[in-house]
Amino acid sequence: MALLSAASTAAMAQDGGSSRFSAEFEIEIANDYTFDSDDPAAELNDTYVTIGAGLSFALAESTSINAGLVFEPILDPADDRFFEDHGLYVEELFLSHDFGGAEVVLGKFNPAFGAAWDLAPGIYGADFAEDYQITEKIGVGINIPITAHGGEHTLSFAMFNADRSLLSNSLGRERGQTNLAAGGVSNTNSPESYSVTVSGNFGATGYNFGVQHQEGGQGDVADQTGVVLGLTHSFDTGSVPWEVLAEVAWFDKFDGTRNSARY
């Protein structure tokens, strides 16, 4: 249950009012309480804060350096806890350049795949859809805007591998630096994994469709492949507009195991 959330934006201007630096912050205080479970050890009360910061600095008119910072619990709760085990880490740090017909992203970023992890409320986003969100990858991405059939669309392609740099660790409660021996899909020597997605809207209806292939790492029995399809539709009912959302995702050899998964 989320208790409090807030978001704010800020910009620093120079050279007669032109803004080169911008920042966006989001703060959420939440409480997760499991009051009954087949496993008594899972009956926990966990209160925590999640703070996200998006920073951008324009090097030129079409070129910028972008960073995403996250402060949140690093460890899963083993007992009741109250604002414990928090750490700060760099989720994204990349250079982007807009060529007009396409944007190129280079560095550490979150490749596009699905949208429910961002759009769905409560546990449907944070606890379910975030299981298949692709985050903290090193590589290159291309985003191509398309205007067609009365709608705005984006075709995205990314090649990547897991981040094993110092940025994979955290400050405060440390999560440790990732290494090849840790295994896990996309944890390879080079960008051998990829995702391809298309998203957009037709009026009040939005959609996203994506495929991914993540190469197995050390100790994994197979490569992971996945497909996602999502739809949204907004209804203007006057003073209280509302939106419906549906997204399904299917994976073969999920997390490099022999198991499939559906969300």
Language model features by range: what are they?
Residues 50-52, 91-94, 103, 139-141, ...:
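Membrane-embedded beta-strand positions in outer-membrane beta-barrel channels/transporters
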